[in-house]
Amino acid sequence: MKVCLVGSSGGHLTHLYMLKPFWENKERFWVTFDKEDARSVLKDEKMYPCYYPTNRSLKALLINTRIAWKVLRKEKPDVIISSGAAVAVPFFYLGKLMGKKLIYIEVFDRIDKPTVTGKMVYPITDRFIVQLSLIHI
């Protein structure tokens, strides 16, 4: 099984890294911002940089959609996993069109409402994981 782990740097990346017991023995690659914290955490991992800031702009969406198209066609993952943020959206929608399994993990610090990214990818995910049950989509 080949795994794509996609997310913003910082807390989102930390959430994905905490899944190490799941992904450590699988073929994998990461998609995140090319920032010092990400380079440090993923120094021994295959990583593709994505465009930032994503700040929900059309420009960022188009650039990251192009990146997603290239990376997904090259790597051909079986599953795409994300905990957000916006960079996950093009990877999930293109991944769905390519027949990939999609797993979204809503960040645990959201206690009363879902993230914007969570709401955007919810309709197409194969597994949507909410860490606190107070959230209603």
Language-model features, listed with the residues they occupy:
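Short, surface-exposed acidic-centric catalytic microdomains
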Residues: K26-I63
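An aromatic- and histidine-rich active-site surface loop
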Residues: V79-M98
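Conserved small/polar residues in nucleotide/adenosyl-binding loops
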Residues: I135-I137
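N-terminal subdomain of nucleotide-sugar transferases
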Residues: M1-F33, R39-L42
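Short internal beta-strands
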Residues: R28-D34, E106, I129-Q131
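An amphipathic, basic-hydrophobic alpha-helix
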Residues: R56-D78
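A conserved, positively charged/aromatic
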Residues: I103-I105, K113-I129
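Active-site proximal beta-strand in glycosyltransferases
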Residues: L94-F108
